Each structure stands twice: as C-alpha cells, then as structure tokens.
Amino acid sequence: MTNATPAPEFKSLRIAVLTISDTRGEAEDVSGKRLVTALTEAGHALAEKAIVRDDKYQIREVLSRWINATNVDAVLTTGGTGITGRDGTPEAIRPLLDKEITGFGEMFRVLSYEDIKTSTLQSRATAGVANATFIFVLPGSSGACQMAWDKLISCLLYTSPSPRDRQKSRMPSSA
C-alpha cells in the first residue's frame, strides 16, 4: 500500500509580461520575448504584454491594472532589479504586494551564483502575491529570465494552485 501523493494536475494560467527599460523597445526586448516563448511553450496563455520606462508610477499603473484584471493570474516583470540609479522595480512593486515570497529571491541568487558568481549579489529579484495574482520581478538579462522560468517559476506555477484559486476555495459557498 502506497501513500504517495498524486501529481498535481496542470492548469494553464493567463500570464502578463512587463518589460521595464529606458532603452528597449519591442524590437530589442529579448527578455520579454523569451518569457513569452517560455510561458506559451509550457502551455500557459499570454494575457497581456507591455514595455514601460524605469518609472515607478508607470510600473505601478500597469501592474495595478493587471492585478485587478480577472484575465491575469500571474505577472512576470523583467528589468530594473539592479543597483544603478534608475533601477527601481522592486521599490515600485513592493507597496502593491499583499505577501512577499522571500524565498524566491534567495533561491534565484543561489542558482544565479552558478553562472555569474558574486555578481548575483547585485540582483534584487523578488516575488509576491498581489490581489491573488502571482508577481515575479526578474532582472533584464535574458539568461536570468530563462533560468528563473526553467528552475523556479514554471515549477511553482505547476505545483501551486494560483492564489486566485486558493482564495475561491476558501470562500463559503452560497446556499
């Protein structure tokens, strides 16, 4: 007799991708395109895609719209996580989060160390949940985005029900 837990059933999510950059337009957005390819190849749907400047108000405006939309289950952002003067994505996003997933950033840096050694200390990648929507805040490097998707995000999205699903399952049923 086995007490093995059955594998979770895959659920396709609707994911939005936000590129944050002062220098990239649609043609130069390698990281955003890579994330779109990864999520669609994994069986998820692209809900929306946008590019905004490194401006906390522009970032918050788009993100606020997406976390309030019923057609977005998760958001992937790329760019603005470094330590230069214009890198302000974590500061722009943190006030919107209901819960921060601190282990995500920690694990991201551990995995990044294999490729970029101590330069990973300059990354401020993070994740959280806002209005029952997963938010993943990634560097602008396409390699970092691919690694985060392959080793962290795709696994989390596959094995964890979306916060929106968990929220619905806790709601009392109407009689």
List each language-model region with its residue ranges.
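Short beta-strand segments
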Residues: 18-21, 77-78, 137-139
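Glycine-rich phosphate/nucleotide-binding loop
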Residues: 87, 91-153
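N-terminal small/polar loop signature for handling phosphorylated ligands or for N-terminal nucleophile
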Residues: 40-42, 47-97
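Short coil/turn connectors at secondary-structure junctions
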Residues: 12-13, 70-72, 130-133
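Glycine-rich phosphate/diphosphate-binding loop of Rossmann-like nucleotide-binding domains
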Residues: 3-54
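Conserved small/polar residues in nucleotide/adenosyl-binding loops
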Residues: 158-163
